């Protein structure tokens, strides 16, 4: 069973999910109570509130009865998300390393070719011009597959010992690691150690003319 969810809350979540799928809108509190054997509407409200608090349900404050099962809720039910998304986790530099951001600021639909691997993907917005020769421009959003190792020459998102992240080509050499920009005017970054957060596998670009 998923963490922070009781058996009764799971029953509430499942009934909401099935009802929304069947009729396009969520059940009433009384319908939920009747379906799972709870006569007290306040008890049902309590379960719904806890499901929201723990991230299994979302409620649109502008619409009455607008409840939506979140990805966390779908995971708790063992249901695969029909519309998987990739979280945008902030900005990473294609220049000097900057502090990494790990909270999602937006979500993008998963391209069809990555649907089977969507849970291992995240996105970052690029700032800087050190990867322009690889076709990665400032303002692009790169798609990154989570992995902790990389072959030489792979474009990666790497984290330094100072917890700063950068987008570069990765090279492990005899006594150091070289993070190589794709810009002839910029020098490589030479480090003793880095943590690879993932491999760049694609990108989105909004400003194509």
Swiss-Prot record:
Its EC number is 3.4.21.88. The record marks 94-95 as: Cleavage. It holds the Pfam family Peptidase_S24. The keyword Transcription regulation applies. It catalyses: Hydrolysis of Ala-|-Gly bond in repressor LexA. The active site is at 130 (for autocatalytic cleavage activity), 168 (for autocatalytic cleavage activity). It comes from the Bacteria. InterPro entries: LexA, LexA-like, LexA/Signal_pep-like_sf, LexA_DNA-bd_dom, LexA_repressor, Peptidase_S24_LexA, Peptidase_S24_S26A/B/C, WH-like_DNA-bd_sf. Residues 29-49 bind DNA. GO terms for molecular function: DNA binding; serine-type endopeptidase activity. Keywords: Autocatalytic cleavage, DNA damage, DNA repair, DNA replication, DNA-binding, Hydrolase, Repressor, SOS response, Transcription, Transcription regulation. It is an enzyme of class 3 (hydrolase). CDD domains: S24_LexA-like (cd06529). One of its GO terms (biological process) is DNA replication. Homodimer. Belongs to the peptidase S24 family. Represses a number of genes involved in the response to DNA damage (SOS response), including recA and lexA. In the presence of single-stranded DNA, RecA interacts with LexA causing an autocatalytic cleavage which disrupts the DNA-binding part of LexA, leading to derepression of the SOS regulon and eventually DNA repair. This is LexA repressor. It comes from Pediococcus pentosaceus (strain ATCC 25745 / CCUG 21536 / LMG 10740 / 183-1w). The gene is lexA.
């Amino acid at each position: 069973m998923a963490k922070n969810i009781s058996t009764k809350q799971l029953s509430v979540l499942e009934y909401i999910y099935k009802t929304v799928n069947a009729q396009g809108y969520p059940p009433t509190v009384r319908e939920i109570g009747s379906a799972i054997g709870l006569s007290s509407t306040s008890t049902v409200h309590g379960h719904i509130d806890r499901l929201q608090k723990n991230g299994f349900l979302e409620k649109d404050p502008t619409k009455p009865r607008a409840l939506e099962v979140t990805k966390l809720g779908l995971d708790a039910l063992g249901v695969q998300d029909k519309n998987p998304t990739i979280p945008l986790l902030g900005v990473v530099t294609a220049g000097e390393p900057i502090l990494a951001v790990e909270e999602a600021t937006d979500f993008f639909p998963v391209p069809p070719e990555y649907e089977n691997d969507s849970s291992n993907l995240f996105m970052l917005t690029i700032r800087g011009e050190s990867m322009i020769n690889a076709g990665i421009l400032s303002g692009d959003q790169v798609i990154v597959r989570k992995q902790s190792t990389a072959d030489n020459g792979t474009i990666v998102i790497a984290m330094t010992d100072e917890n700063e992240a950068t987008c570069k080509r990765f090279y492990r050499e005899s006594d150091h690691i070289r993070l190589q920009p794709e810009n002839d005017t910029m020098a490589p970054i030479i480090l003793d150690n880095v943590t690879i957060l993932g491999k760049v596998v694609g990108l989105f670009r909004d400003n194509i003319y």
